[in-house]
Amino acid sequence: MSYRKLGRTSAQRKAMLRDLTTDLIINERIETTETRAKELRSVVEKMITLGKRGDLHARRQAAAYIRNEVANEENNQDALQKLFSDIATRYEERQGGYTRIMKLGPRRGDGAPMAIIELV
């Protein structure tokens, strides 16, 4: 299995990817470094595929990974509900390729290459 270490321990890396995945599901578009976006892409694609499956086991697998954060305050919807009700139905006929990565310029402080990752 191939992955990027991202300069962190495995627990820190997993926590960061969980946070970024939850943020991408809630906001549908985030700005991060290019390598984080490329690593995040595979995780988000798996979560959306779980959402498309839609059974109880898939919901529990996604709930074990996605943080319990409020996605929409007016109808009290959390990130997991948004994944299974809104995002999964949007990509029902699409077979993968749910995300798009657009490269930006370098970050001002350290020159790290930045990118925007968004749901298609």
Swiss-Prot record:
Keywords: Ribonucleoprotein, Ribosomal protein
Record PROSITE patterns: RIBOSOMAL_L17
UniProt GO cellular component terms: cytosolic large ribosomal subunit
Any one GO molecular function term: structural constituent of ribosome
Gene3D superfamilies per UniProt: Ribosomal protein L17 (3.90.1030.10)
GO BP: translation
Similarity field: Belongs to the bacterial ribosomal protein bL17 family.
Self-association state and partner proteins as the record states: Part of the 50S ribosomal subunit. Contacts protein L32.
Listed PANTHER family: LARGE RIBOSOMAL SUBUNIT PROTEIN BL17M (PTHR14413:SF16), RIBOSOMAL PROTEIN L17 (PTHR14413)
Protein name, as recorded: Large ribosomal subunit protein bL17
Species lineage: Bacteria, Bacillati, Bacillota, Bacilli, Bacillales
